A protein has these predicted regions:
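Ligand-binding grooves and catalytic loops that recognize ribose/phosphate and carbohydrate rings
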Residues: 112
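Cysteine-cluster motifs in flexible loop/terminal segments that predominantly coordinate metals
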Residues: 60-106
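Short, acidic, Ser/Thr-enriched surface-loop or helix-capping motifs
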Residues: 20-21
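C-terminal accessory region of radical SAM enzymes
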Residues: 1-2, 25-76
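Short flanking/linker segments adjacent to small metal-binding domains or redox-active Cys/His motifs
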Residues: 76, 115-123
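Short, small/polar residue-rich loop motifs at catalytic or cofactor-binding pockets
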Residues: 11-15
Length: 123
């Protein structure tokens, strides 16, 4: 059904699953090391209901292209990738084919950054 596709479709981080680290820290995803809480201090339910986790369940909060995309309820983009590139889990997913303009901008930004590397680093 459409409802099931929209629920299961795309990334399940913070919507269908969460990651639990060995010491009890809960993150929305293994690729998003943002600690939301710790099971030694709070219940899983309280962590799951944290406002930060709600960002993953409410796709109407998505920004940029992902927020306007007709597939946002089926896809939703990778929230970890958005966070790692922009520092915001609600930002557009730069890896999405429908978001190619943003991807080109990121590539241009990377080319403008000049990194000095010591030749000793490769010996």
């Amino acid at each position: 059904t459409k409802e099931l596709t929209e629920f299961i479709g795309g990334c399940g981080a913070g919507r269908v699953y969460a990651a639990i680290e060995p010491e009890g820290t809960v993150t929305p995803c293994v690729f998003l090391p943002y600690p939301v809480g710790n099971l030694r201090i709070k219940s899983f339910w309280d962590i799951w209901m944290d406002p930060f986790m709600e960002n993953f369940r409410n796709r109407d909060r998505l920004k940029g292209f992902c927020g306007k995309c007709p597939y946002k309820l089926i896809c939703g983009g990778c929230r970890a990738r958005a966070y790692n590139y922009f520092g915001d889990v609600l930002a557009p997913d730069p890896g999405c084919i429908y978001n190619s303009a943003e991807w080109r901008k990121l590539q241009e930004d990377i080319l403008r950054i000049k990194v000095k590397v010591s030749p000793l680093a490769f010996k």
